[in-house]
């Protein structure tokens, strides 16, 4: 691994906690000592390590070397469990250059040891190490994949040593490579990360171009749990790639680790055979590159699978400790399944890597959105393994449109001379919406009506091949340009093509901030050559966008040109999507093919791709279908009528209201979610407040814009920010639905139309029983259906409000209570947050986790008992906040906002919740006091020991019917779970310190199965369920699996 990893001469004595003595090298050891004391400059990296030790303790490292020993001082051993080892900042073989600023070059071994012993509590080591290897060589048999790994911090580290990073000297720039995974650490326990993996991002923060110090600082700033995106290499053996018959595959794994494959049975020639169903990303099997989903398993360690059942094959595979020999029949590449295994991304090895500081990055990923795959797949590569999709954040690659089409518009004509086409465009270099009037449009090439937009493009290249971009302008190279130069050619598979934002015919307005119009063509080309030496260039580009006719509603088709390995530029979102609901286009890359058509907008719903319907298609499959399209892609689009500015067809009116606050509050409470296209509505009005006195604003009205800033595609937090900085005059654009009641609906948000309003067929599909979409796992069933008598649920995100009380001027104490306690019932919607702006609102949080529940300072009217109730109620809510039950808090608020205690199961998506009048119970304040003053939720930590006879824990789990969640279904009498106090309907929030609040049984059952002999659970329980004698109802014939 590192140069310092070399043997010590026999007979060396350990002179102390820091000492590693050694005899002077002689004879054959001289060359070894020379190698130890010098790392070539081009492979040398420097880092600073800071360690804080307790008084009387040691660092836990052994130092060898010194002027009287065999070379420079270096780390020869790290004591397991010691401070240095747990810091994950040092490797064996690292050279120590200085300690607290004192250089060790001229110190003897004993002097170094004395220095370390007396250095004090704070130790700063300057460390020299060998840089990790550079980018992998171009090899068509090596592909790079990425995987998202969630790790829990242990101390200040995650259990791995990170080296490399960007450097001022380009020759020393390296990827951020894991050079050591500490045994027993968080990364080792999780099992996915291996030495040599490259770190791409942490919690969505990209690290390409980051130095080693920056990367370490990012890791230190992470919270207790962090999401790492890691790249790893997979080498496909030639024998597998060219296989035409059965193969024998031998895989060596660490004892105790899992292979990472799951088996299934399929039918082949009317005979049941065992095949590979899925391969876990970054597992031993995945990294081997020898096995693929769909491969037919002929034998396992010499045992034929011809007459084995699936269960027997799975047990046989799990019983093998170190070396596994599988005889397989590889599935043909053309028959490999469309669905890949989890979050895996395939790239061409000859392309630039994301850790390289020269890789183009034109867009920041959004959490919760799936973007298109980052890299292209080589010709002939298996497409079933080239998909990237994660529920967190995946980076976007911007590909280019076909360079054979020289227009900036898809299917356009040849560009004219810059002298005849650029003169009239220069003065219009500003951003436009694609819905601009014809007054701001021009006639582009081919007679098409267009308007111009500008964007900034960052390209990364190298001095040899440059950026793959050629410019054209003027007649002579030394002639002063009267208009910007044109992009006249884009080299295939170059950075200019891969970025996806450039097309032939685009005008380059500036290069690295230097305008091109006042210079010469030679100067522009020189700027590009100089930028290539620095590996990076920033271009300001002007391009044409078609003035297309955009339907305000309804369904239509869009045809886009598509080139293999070049994406369309659309981002698909499914953060809150349920089965049967369409995918949403959440973002369109400016300058991409999709953007230049002028037809697509964020918020559009994607119904089909090339006539393949996406009703029940997972987002990963939709991305894969887009990737496999070539030449021409036909998209079926439905406009988002709720977000449409054209309101005639939606039965709604919009108008603008101007409010002058004069230092006072607006008197409104807004409600919404952090989903970009969920509506933001007015959920409460202060009695006799400014907004209510206008008579133009009502509860349930939807806010379309604040001070002329559209809220389309913006979450609630941005709307809150706009109100905070709005000033004295606030202009609200309001949308009011006329053909629907203005009072809050029982089914969710007032202003969000369900799919049933737009597509009756989709509505029928959306209303089917949940069992129709139940996963094919025999041990999973639903228990939430039996919870219909509960009013709240721990751990679910329900409706909520945030109503700061501090600055409500001119109102009674009753009005200064939280907005959901007032008379006007605002609309309720799962996971919604409300916000009431006030004149003193400077830094209100976006969520309700710091709500002020203190009673009013002035005396409140009414009996003292009511005031005491609200004080006790506020204290109870504060207790819920402190124990992490803010989402339960929102659910409690929902019940009081509507004045009812709901008896229906909760559903995470608005528009489908079956609120029925017959299932409501009116609640008086006295009843609510009785309901809410006792603890509404019990939290229990349960430790169970596996039954040695039955090898289980004596309980089964089931899914939530309408929400994600894992619940205890049945408890076996006298079993471990029964003796431990577990009860049916308990919700499992943690399993062995892993949060399962948002899991379903597909994720939780393997976690429970791998728990070993001791299982630690944190469960939530409603007090009244402890006395319920009803057994949970099974939704289907399948029986739950006993764990």
UniProtKB/Swiss-Prot annotation:
Keyword Kinase: no
Compositionally biased residues, Polar residues: 399-420
GO cellular component: cytosol; glutamatergic synapse; plasma membrane
Entry's localization field: Cytoplasm; Membrane
Subunit organization: Interacts with EFNB1, EFNB3, GRIA2, GRIA3, CSPG4 and GRIPAP1. Can form homomultimers and heteromultimers with GRIP1. Interacts with the C-terminal tail of PRLHR.
UniProt comment concerning the protein's domains: PDZ 5 mediates the C-terminal binding of GRIA2 and GRIA3. PDZ 6 mediates interaction with the PDZ recognition motif of EFNB1. PDZ 7 mediates interaction with CSPG4.
Protein name: Glutamate receptor-interacting protein 2
Gene: GRIP2
